[in-house]
């Protein structure tokens, strides 16, 4: 896949990429492959695969949600920067915070952000469970994203405490989303959220089905959540 083809696919979805943004995606791909030789960032390294399964997929929330306003976005468990860095490239006015529990991934992201010349990005080496208890972080973000990092009850406990009341939690899932949504219903309600929409689409070239679950934060999360690191995964709210 050429970058211009990627540009055209996003254009069809109403997202226009500048020449600078295109160049940033190209450099992102180069750095991802280069650093992947030193550390495990992604199993997908071929150019078409990265552009479709990482870049296009990461930008997909903007097909259904208005990213034109300058709001704060927190990406939980971003790994190699997905979905927040592609979203930031497309929408430079976003104020982005990235939380990841692995220091080596944060090192990659620091290098990436510098190389791409991205501003207004904060990187945190932390677990979501403890990050949400830091002063100034809890219930402070307009949008919180997570891309396939855990099952829905677990994701909700990691992300909704960071989402401000009136804000939105976007859970980006693969094809198993309907079962996960059912499994996560109780946790979402307990944590102060309400599912407002689910959007399902196919990646280009039939590279798989994706679903985005939109959860609005309607009331404050009870103070006991999130629980200690590891507990949400071992004993999910059900």
From Swiss-Prot:
Enzyme nomenclature, EC number = 2.1.1.-
Question: What GO terms are given for molecular function?
Answer: rRNA (guanine-N7-)-methyltransferase activity
Q: Name one Pfam family in it.
A: GidB
Parts of the chain that traverse the membrane: none
Localization per Swiss-Prot or TrEMBL: Cytoplasm
* Binding positions (S-adenosyl-L-methionine): 77, 82, 128-129, 147
Q: Which GO terms describe its cellular component?
A: cytosol
Keyword Methyltransferase attributed: yes
Metal-binding recorded as keyword: no
Family annotation (CDD domains): AdoMet_MTases (cd02440)
Q: What is the superkingdom listed in this entry's lineage?
A: Bacteria
Primary site of residence: cytoplasm
According to the record, the residues making up region (Disordered) are 219-238
Q: Which UniProt keywords apply?
A: Cytoplasm, Methyltransferase, rRNA processing, S-adenosyl-L-methionine, Transferase
Q: What does this protein do?
A: Specifically methylates the N7 position of guanine in position 535 of 16S rRNA.
Q: Which HAMAP family match?
A: 16SrRNA_methyltr_G
Write out the similarity annotation. Belongs to the methyltransferase superfamily. RNA methyltransferase RsmG family.
Spell out the protein name for this chain: Ribosomal RNA small subunit methyltransferase G
Q: What is the lineage of its organism?
A: Bacteria, Bacillati, Bacillota, Bacilli, Bacillales
